[in-house]
């Protein structure tokens, strides 16, 4: 039915927690939700982003490949002497998970243009799937520039950006962070659906569910 790709302005901006929020939101609306992490680096089998999403939401996800070192996937694969990912194979696997009343939530690695393999990025995956993007950004000093660059890079590739989610929002934001929240929609031209509090990954399923209700995620996208 629908596939959406969650990417970020950088690594460690809160993509996994935001992906969990998106999964929780559509699951509560009655959709069958399938979280997908095409590639995980730096985590042993049984741990990683898919497992974090499962812990927060109870929804079991898919991870297609793992490379040992916490690097860009192409570099981690190279250094381990492992075969790199294949774009067509990844796209076909994701398409196979789609179906009636299904929302497939694909979480990228790092930022929009991080190399999943030498020959492609998560932007290329989204383009092949004709899937829109959700961009996760922090709100600290410098985030306006990073968010605008990410949105611009996506749009120049013909990708639709549905919305922004702020990740790892501190309990007591400083002046720059507070102002950036107010300015984010203006500089990017993309709606900010809300921000996820710092430490949300440690919440119980019940508390995380309440947090998701405070976000302004859309019922469904056109």
Curated annotation (Swiss-Prot):
It comes from the Bacteria. Its main location: cytoplasm. It catalyses: (7R,8S)-7,8-diammoniononanoate + CO2 + ATP = (4R,5S)-dethiobiotin + ADP + phosphate + 3 H(+). Keywords: ATP-binding, Biotin biosynthesis, Cytoplasm, Ligase, Magnesium, Metal-binding, Nucleotide-binding. GO terms for molecular function: ATP binding; dethiobiotin synthase activity; magnesium ion binding. Its cofactor is Mg(2+). It is found in: Cytoplasm. Pfam families: AAA_26. The active site is at 37. Catalyzes a mechanistically unusual reaction, the ATP-dependent insertion of CO2 between the N7 and N8 nitrogen atoms of 7,8-diaminopelargonic acid (DAPA, also called 7,8-diammoniononanoate) to form a ureido ring. Belongs to the dethiobiotin synthetase family. This is ATP-dependent dethiobiotin synthetase BioD. The gene is bioD.
């Amino acid at each position: 039915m629908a596939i959406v790709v969650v990417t970020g302005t950088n690594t460690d901006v809160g993509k996994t927690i935001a992906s969990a929020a998106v999964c929780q939101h559509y699951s509560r609306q009655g959709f069958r939700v399938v979280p997908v992490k095409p590639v995980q680096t730096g985590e042993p089998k049984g741990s990683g982003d898919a497992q974090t999403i499962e812990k927060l939401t109870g929804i079991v996800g898919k991870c297609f490949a793992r490379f040992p070192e916490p690097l860009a996937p192409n570099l981690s694969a190279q250094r381990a002497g492992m075969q790199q990912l294949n774009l067509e194979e990844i796209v076909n696997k994701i398409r196979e998970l789609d179906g009636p009343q299904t929302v497939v939530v694909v979480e990228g690695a790092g930022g929009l243009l991080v190399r999943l393999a030498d020959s492609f990025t998560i932007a290329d995956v989204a383009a092949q799937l004709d899937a829109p993007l959700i961009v996760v950004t922090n709100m600290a000093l410098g985030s306006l520039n990073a968010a605008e660059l990410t949105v611009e890079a996506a749009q120049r590739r013909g990708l639709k950006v549905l919305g922004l989610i702020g990740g790892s929002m501190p309990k007591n934001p400083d002046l720059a962070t507070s102002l950036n929240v107010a300015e984010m929609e203006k500089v990017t031209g993309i709606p900010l659906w809300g921000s996820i509090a710092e430490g949300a990954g440690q919440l119980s399923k019940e508390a995380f569910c309440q947090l998701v209700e405070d976000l302004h995620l859309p019922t469904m996208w056109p």
